[in-house]
Amino acid sequence: RSSDLPINDAKVEWLFKNPINDGGQFTGISDNLYKYGVVPAEIMPETASSSNTKLLGKMLARTLRQTGIQLRNASEKGESLAQLRKRKEDGLKKVYRLLSLNLGVPPTSFSYTLKDKDGKVISTETYTPQSFYERFVGTDLRGQFVMLMNDPSRPYYKVYEIEYDRHAYDGKNWTYVNLPMDEIKQMAIASLKDNTM
């Protein structure tokens, strides 16, 4: 909880400067896939905002900052935990509305027709995003892979975890093993050669 810290605390400043990131770390993707599932592009196609997220990211960041300031001010005025939770939920409703308007509302269930390479129908079934993930991915990707990174500002051959860098509240922080670039390069080449990537 950062509301007990002064507004000029380094952690608070970082949270307000970076209320949302562009994503892309494997741990965040695997957390979200496991939690929410997936849908085929035919069911939920790209939108202008999903293929170019810069403006949406700015709108989300502004909404999150406004909500954060409102929560801090309300906390300083002594509002109850129930009142603060209500304010937080109101802020999250604004976030959901922005996402829904820009990306669409994900389906809770959908029918999908599986076809072979020649276009012949194999089956048509009803799925939820989670059941589609289970059927076509079938593996819980969380904890199955290790991220390798080159960060020369930190000692090599150690595991690092970046606090507050996750895609879901209950997800895992971005964690990586810090290695010299030459070793990462050798591992990438070996992985490509033996098809384990």
Model-derived regions, located:
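Surface-exposed loop and adjacent secondary-structure segments within mature catalytic domains
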Residues: 13, 34-68
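Aromatic-residue-lined binding/catalytic grooves and analogous aromatic/hydrophobic interfacial grooves
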Residues: 65-167, 173-179, 191-194
